[in-house]
Structures are given as structure tokens and as C-alpha cells.
Amino acid sequence: MQESWLGFEDGDNLFKITPTAIDINDTRALHVAELTRDALRNMGRYIAGASVLICGASYRQDVGDTRYSGSELVVRRLAEIGADMRVHDPYVAHWYEFEQQETYPAPGHSWSRFFRNQDDLVNLRVNKELPAALKGVEAVILAVPHSQYLNLKPAEIVKWAGNPVAVIDCFGILSDDVIRDYFKLGCEVKALGRGHIQRIKEEIRKAGS
């Protein structure tokens, strides 16, 4: 297999190399990574080198347990194609699946063995302060519907990031009105199971023309 994937600026070919060890139930996480890449592309940006914040490390809302978290695979896939990953979670202090990925949950059992470009993820640390975590990011993934994320205001997100961002909604957190506000601020929005978002985008575009 060629190693030229490192030269791909937006991960097109790499996304075709889905690790066969990943169960079909985990492909949802890989789709989130694709949506992130596509959202950034729509903004004229590349996933490689982009700063991406994943909001939610735990396996479900309002708990601090990272075991079996779908967010782990999202982070690993995005890191594989060159994204600079950050994480925020109000309930998680340490994400040991990354910090101790050589030995946790047991030596040789980490998901890291199925992905490339994983070495730097041992330095991934959970940020507890959302404004600080957002500073300078280009994409935000709402990966877990923690209470803190349910009423975030688009204007605040853009202010804290310092620029329009790509927003990926994994759990239907964003209402249509909030999505409209993101588009008005120059952001891009993608979501799982929300095919009508493109119509909202066109509606905003036509209203502003």
C-alpha cells in the first residue's frame, strides 16, 4: 500500500481505506469525520492541519465515562488525515484511551493500532473551559449532547473561535433557527440525519443576495 496518503490535502483517498477491524456500528464515527472534512472544504479550507474541537469525550450525555465512546474513533480518524485535535468535556478529567494508548485498556488493545498518525494523540488533554478550547479552532464537533452544549449561541461560538467555524451536529442538538444563525455568521453546518440543512443554507444565501 502506498504511503502517499500523507500528501493528500483533504483526505479523499484515505477515506476509502476504512479499517476492516472497525465494526459496522462504528462507521457512524467515520461518517462524522467525513462530514467535518466536507464542511471545511465548503469553507475553502483543508482538513489537514485544521484545528478541530470535539465537544464530548464520554460515551453518553452528562457522564464522565469514556469507555466505548464513539468520540474516540472520530478523533482517531481525523488525526489520521492530519487534523489538529482538541477536546472539551465538562465531565471528563482524563481521556486515558489517548493519554495511555499504549497500555490502556490493556497493552495491544488500543484502537490506535488500526489508524495511522496516532503518536501525537498521547498529548491530547481534556479542556474544561469552552471559550479557551474554542480559541482559533476551524471546526467544532458536537459529539455528545451534554447539557452545557444544548443552548450554545452561535455568536458566542464564533466570538470565542475568532472566526466562522464548521459545525458538525451528531445528535440533533441544533434547532433549525440556530442553524440559520450559524449560516448568517458565515459558518458551515453539517449533521447526521439532517438532510434538510442544505435547504436552510440555500434559503439564507438567497435572502442575502
Per-region residue spans from a language model:
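Structural/interface elements that position substrates and couple domains in central-metabolism enzymes
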Residues: 1-209
